[in-house]
Design a protein with these regions (language model features):
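Active-site microenvironment for binding and transforming phosphate-containing groups
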Residues: 1-164
Length: 164
């Protein structure tokens, strides 16, 4: 691992963070690991998928991750299907809990503070794009299909269209 990334272990929740994002003011971000959650068995420990486990366990895992990352707001999620679809989310998506897109998408853009953009990856690439001047960000799930379709470029275009 390079000096650009570092592990953080807050209250037993181990996350990976990016120094560059910290330095440009995007301090509340993280890449999760499995360490620090309440899930057991094949899901252990920090399962964040509502489709595979009791809701109360998943909510507790999110609470722990958010606390470790210093985040206290709303989270947005989608059903990822290896597309090039990037959704814009804003203050209307602040539910005080979780907002799930009503259609498939593999990325989000926003300039709204207090929104956690959640993507899931296994063997795909998580992409975070940050614009420190506009205080806007994109979070992208880029698998081989999405990469071939140009999802990262779609996220950059959406950032430029929405925020200049």
């Amino acid at each position: 691992m390079t000096d650009s990334f570092y592990f953080d272990n807050t209250n037993g929740v181990k996350t990976l963070r990016c120094r560059t994002l910290d330095e440009i003011g995007f301090k509340k971000h993280c890449f999760t690991t499995r360490a620090g959650g309440v899930s057991r068995g094949y899901l252990s420990e920090t399962n964040l998928s509502f489709s595979r486990e009791a809701r109360e366990n998943v909510l507790e895992n999110y609470r722990r991750v958010f606390e470790a990352a210093g985040f206290s707001g709303s989270a947005v999620l989608s059903n990822q299907e290896h597309t090039d679809i990037v959704l814009t989310v804003d203050g209307t998506h602040k539910t005080g809990g979780f907002w799930t897109a009503d259609r498939a998408a593999d990325g989000f853009v926003t300039n709204e503070r207090g929104l956690c953009l959640v993507i899931f990856v296994a063997d795909c690439v998580p992409v975070i794009i940050a614009d420190p001047q506009k205080k806007a960000a994109a979070c992208v799930h880029s698998g081989w299909r999405g990469t071939a379709l140009g999802i990262t470029a779609a996220a950059v275009r959406k950032l430029m269209q929405n925020y200049g």
